[in-house]
């Protein structure tokens, strides 16, 4: 295994064979910074379902409250008109979707939304903007939003695209807790989904965030037509970031009419659960977030995801421009499963 100057890890070989012995599996639970290659992650995904979930649950219980789930709320502070060509995204200007462009929200709008989220039990408030990256004129408003969210006693997170030099430091000085910038998929499958920015661009922004002292929120999307090996490649890339992200959102593709990925063959729900389990095993201390796609998931599938190690969700009826389960449905599910918010 080797790593390029750009940060993409060459993770095709394994020194330990396809699957470690059972004793190695157990001893490996406490090894926070093991190196994971694609073959080892794929071997995890290939395990019998009960064995995989059992292993993930052991890891989860060692590092986390098994019945605690963080509630986060995500809003769009600038909607539509994005110049990128991400094949899953209804906010791309080149696709004909029902998303209406919206200028930047005011700080007052964000304060009202954050206060409502806190009243509903959210502890983290995330703000997303549809653009390639923030211009300097945008940063003043974003910094004010971050400070306002922090003043309410919430964790603040932003997802603003690619950052220029110095912008991460501005966000850190404002008190930003987390910056989200997903890898989306494996390096090998990436070109099938996005062509307007490359993998190295994403890694460069993550490096800027780390150097500024901000926690990293980084995950991906599954169900985009990728192979199991590509899912293993995504997890391996995330797990081999140094250090791995503090927060790992695993999104299920939400198919939106008008985007290139609309009509993609649906992913087996158990394959999604397997991906959650692999994320938990390979990144034991991270918060693994069950993210987009929950509205379409049966409660039983979500329950399996929590069993597999998910311990964070987006809470509220909307994620940027796509739907999310209603708060009352989530509360009822938590009651049925004996879960509590953290």
Curated annotation (Swiss-Prot):
[4Fe-4S] cluster binds at residues 82, 86, 89. The keyword Protein biosynthesis does not apply. Signal peptide: none annotated. PROSITE patterns: RADICAL_SAM. GO terms for molecular function: 2 iron, 2 sulfur cluster binding; 4 iron, 4 sulfur cluster binding; biotin synthase activity; iron ion binding. Residues 67-294 form the Radical SAM core domain. Its cofactor is [4Fe-4S] cluster; [2Fe-2S] cluster. [2Fe-2S] cluster binds at residues 126, 157, 217, 289. The keyword S-adenosyl-L-methionine applies. InterPro entries: Aldolase_TIM, BATS_dom, Biotin_synth/BioAB, Biotin_synthase, Elp3/MiaA/NifB-like_rSAM, rSAM. SUPFAM superfamilies: Radical SAM enzymes (SSF102114). Pathway: Cofactor biosynthesis; biotin biosynthesis; biotin from 7,8-diaminononanoate: step 2/2. GO terms for biological process: biotin biosynthetic process. Binds 1 [4Fe-4S] cluster. The cluster is coordinated with 3 cysteines and an exchangeable S-adenosyl-L-methionine. Binds 1 [2Fe-2S] cluster. The cluster is coordinated with 3 cysteines and 1 arginine. Its EC number is 2.8.1.6. Homodimer. HAMAP family: BioB. This is Biotin synthase. It comes from Nitrosospira multiformis (strain ATCC 25196 / NCIMB 11849 / C 71).
């Amino acid at each position: 295994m080797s790593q390029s100057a750009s940060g993409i890890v060459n993770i095709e070989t394994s020194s330990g064979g396809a699957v470690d012995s059972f004793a190695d599996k157990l001893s490996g639970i406490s090894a926070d910074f093991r190196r994971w290659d694609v073959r080892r992650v794929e071997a995890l995904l290939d395990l019998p379902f009960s064995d995989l979930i059992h292993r993930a649950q052991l890891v989860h219980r060692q590092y986390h409250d098994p019945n605690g789930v963080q509630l986060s709320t995500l809003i769009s502070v600038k909607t539509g008109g994005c110049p990128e060509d991400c094949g899953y995204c209804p906010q791309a200007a080149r696709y004909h979707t029902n998303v209406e462009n919206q200028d930047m929200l005011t700080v007052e709008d964000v304060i009202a939304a954050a206060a409502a989220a806190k009243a509903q039990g959210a502890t983290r408030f995330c703000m997303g903007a549809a653009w390639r990256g923030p211009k300097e004129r945008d940063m003043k408003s974003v910094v004010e939003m971050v400070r306002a969210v922090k003043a309410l006693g919430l964790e603040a997170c932003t997802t603003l695209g690619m950052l220029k030099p110095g912008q991460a430091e501005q966000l850190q000085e404002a008190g930003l807790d987390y910056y989200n910038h997903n890898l989306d998929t494996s390096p090998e499958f990436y070109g099938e989904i996005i062509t307007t920015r490359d993998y190295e661009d994403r890694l460069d922004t993550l490096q800027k965030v780390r150097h500024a002292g901000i926690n990293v929120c980084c995950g991906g999307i599954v169900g985009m037509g990728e192979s199991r090996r590509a899912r293993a490649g995504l997890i391996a890339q995330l797990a081999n970031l140094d250090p791995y992200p503090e927060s790992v959102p695993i999104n299920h593709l939400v198919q939106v009419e008008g985007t290139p990925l609309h009509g993609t063959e649906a992913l087996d729900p158990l394959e999604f659960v397997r991906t959650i389990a692999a994320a938990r095993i390979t990144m034991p201390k991270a918060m693994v977030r069950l993210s987009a796609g929950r509205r379409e998931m049966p409660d039983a599938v979500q329950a399996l995801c929590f069993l597999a190690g998910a311990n964070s969700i987006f809470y509220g009826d909307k994620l940027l421009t796509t739907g999310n389960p209603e708060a009352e449905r989530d509360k009822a599910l938590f009651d049925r499963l004996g879960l509590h918010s953290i």
